[in-house]
């Protein structure tokens, strides 16, 4: 009887951790961000807040292009799917926010967006070349905001989502925001499950207890 041959996980891992393969994946992954950034800065109605918010996307693109090649990458296809939906869901989310209505003075969400951008820029600069969308071991980062929470980029993202709800409220905006928060929280847990096989990250988890908000969660 013939047997079905399955792919060798170690060979596939070796393939994914090849520098040129990782670089190619990174370039493909940031393509939607590049397109979004182009439309953002060519928009005749570009505001100061949206212009500043684009800075963190620029940092994302640069660090992804020059990111460190991982020593391990998850081979779980569900984790890759989650990373895809959570990452690009945020980009898609902004397309729906203009359909809502503000429920507070515009200065409030504008201030929150600037706060979220500051958090994410600080976190992205601190993370540096260890960035990635799917769970991968690119070196453990403990500097900057990572001294206080384990997922500061997501923390900034949560603040931004809350700001957009206040600025462009609608049932759809609220529903999408809640779904995205849930996906990012799940992504955080999955990333930690993968990384804690590294003793250095396991020790980091005991030192920094909170995932998103110091002293809270």
What is the meaning of each model-derived region?
Residues 134-156:
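Active-site-proximal inter-transmembrane loops
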Residues 1-134, 163-217:
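Membrane-anchoring alpha-helices and their flanking helix-loop junctions
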């Amino acid at each position: 009887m013939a047997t079905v041959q399955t792919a060798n996980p170690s060979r596939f891992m070796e393939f994914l951790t090849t520098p040129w393969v990782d670089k190619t994946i990174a370039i493909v992954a940031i393509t939607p961000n590049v397109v979004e950034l182009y439309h953002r800065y060519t928009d005749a109605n570009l505001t100061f807040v949206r212009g500043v918010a684009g800075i963190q996307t620029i940092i994302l693109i640069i660090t992804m292009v020059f990111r460190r090649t991982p020593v391990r990458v998850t081979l779980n296809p569900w984790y890759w799917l989650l990373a895809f939906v959570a990452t690009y869901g945020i980009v898609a989310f902004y397309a729906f926010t203009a359909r809502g209505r503000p429920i507070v003075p515009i200065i409030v969400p504008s201030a929150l967006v600037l706060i979220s951008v500051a958090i994410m820029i600080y976190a992205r600069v601190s993370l540096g070349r260890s960035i990635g969308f799917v769970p991968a071991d690119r070196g453990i980062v403990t500097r900057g905001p990572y001294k206080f929470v384990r997922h500061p980029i997501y923390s900034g993202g949560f603040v931004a989502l809350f700001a957009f709800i206040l600025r462009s409220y609608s049932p759809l905006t609220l529903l999408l925001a809640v779904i995205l928060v849930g996906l990012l929280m799940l992504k955080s847990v999955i990333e930690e499950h993968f990384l804690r096989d590294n003793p250095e990250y396991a020790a980091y988890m005991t030192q920094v207890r909170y995932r998103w908000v110091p002293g809270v969660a």
